[in-house]
Design a protein with these regions (language model features):
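Helix-start/capping segments and mature chain N-termini
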Residues: 1-119, 123, 151-275
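Short boundary motifs at domain starts and secondary-structure transition points
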Residues: 130-131, 154
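Intrinsically disordered, low-complexity linker/loop segments enriched in Gly/Pro
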Residues: 126, 146-148
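Extended, Lys/Arg-enriched charged tracts that mediate electrostatic binding to polyanionic substrates
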Residues: 132-142, 146
Length: 275
């Protein structure tokens, strides 16, 4: 998919870069961020002009609905650099479409393609030096949207902020991942928001994952909420199981996130290509 470009976008450049202060060989996932971020507000029923500005904290009303009712969604993807210094993304259109599906489920406005994809393209152009070549080096991309409208009435917000921040990264896991099967806690339920990449889906996993970590496991493979006998997905990924020469994976439904890697692999698993 060709990335769209924005006809209008305000760019405020950082006074200086902190890139030379970063040890790219010893990164903790998600703790270091690039010099700039994309910000675009939704108010009065319309998306405003997006801005790329220096990465920094921002002010928000204490009564904003994101704090009280969890109206927040996000995506996660990575940029890679090849030996010719070209920057690549893996099917970002899928993340864009999934982001808007999550927005719809959470009663949030969909983000236009030119703001999401065009803004991402421009941000990556500015921050291309943060994408390092070599095996294991990536630039993690975190698009997200939060409800910024003030007031504690239990209703959808009328104002939102869409942002994209970037973080240089290496492997999320440094070695093999030890998992435990969920027998009590559930990630999602029928009729819930399991298929949305909503912030609350992840915070709800923190406590059972903490218990699993204390037992020496890095991740939980979640099971259905009714019987805990049907394997669904892990906390950070979809999963496949190989039994002899057959691969098994749960069908996507309203409880399971429709993973981009999973979706991309399925055609080749169902219809193998001779090599």
């Amino acid at each position: 998919m060709e990335l769209k470009t924005l006809s209008e976008i305000e760019i405020i450049s950082a006074a200086s870069s902190k890139i030379n202060e970063v040890d790219f060989e010893n990164l903790t996932f998600g703790n270091v961020f690039t010099d700039h971020m994309l910000v675009c507000d939704y108010k009065d029923g319309a998306w405003q002009k997006p801005v790329i500005e220096p990465y920094a904290p921002f002010m928000i009303d204490p009564s904003s609905k994101v704090f009280h009712y969890g109206q927040a969604i996000f995506e996660g993807m990575k940029a890679y650099k090849d030996e010719q210094d070209a920057v690549w993304l893996f099917r970002p259109d899928e993340n864009f479409h999934r982001f808007n599906k999550s927005a719809s489920r959470m009663a949030m406005p969909e983000v236009p393609e030119d703001i999401f994809m065009g803004g991402l393209h421009k941000l990556l152009e500015i921050e291309k030096d943060w994408v390092k070549k070599g095996k294991g080096n990536t630039l993690y991309i975190r698009p997200f949207m939060i409800a910024t409208g003030h007031g504690v009435i239990a209703a959808p917000s009328s104002e939102y902020r869409f942002m994209i921040i970037l973080s240089p990264a290496r492997a999320y896991y440094s070695g093999e991942v030890k998992v435990i099967i969920a027998e009590h806690f559930s990630r999602a339920a029928n009729g819930g928001i399991g298929a949305a990449k909503a912030a609350g889906n992840y915070s709800a996993q923190f406590y059972p994952t903490k218990l699993a970590n204390e037992k020496g496991f890095q991740q939980i493979i979640w099971t259905d909420d009714a019987t805990h006998t049907k394997l669904e997905e892990a906390g950070t990924m979809n999963v496949f199981f190989r039994i002899n020469d057959t691969l098994f994976t749960a069908q996507t439904n309203k409880r399971i996130l429709d993973g981009v890697t999973r979706k991309s692999a399925e055609p080749y698993i169902l219809h193998p290509i001779a090599v």
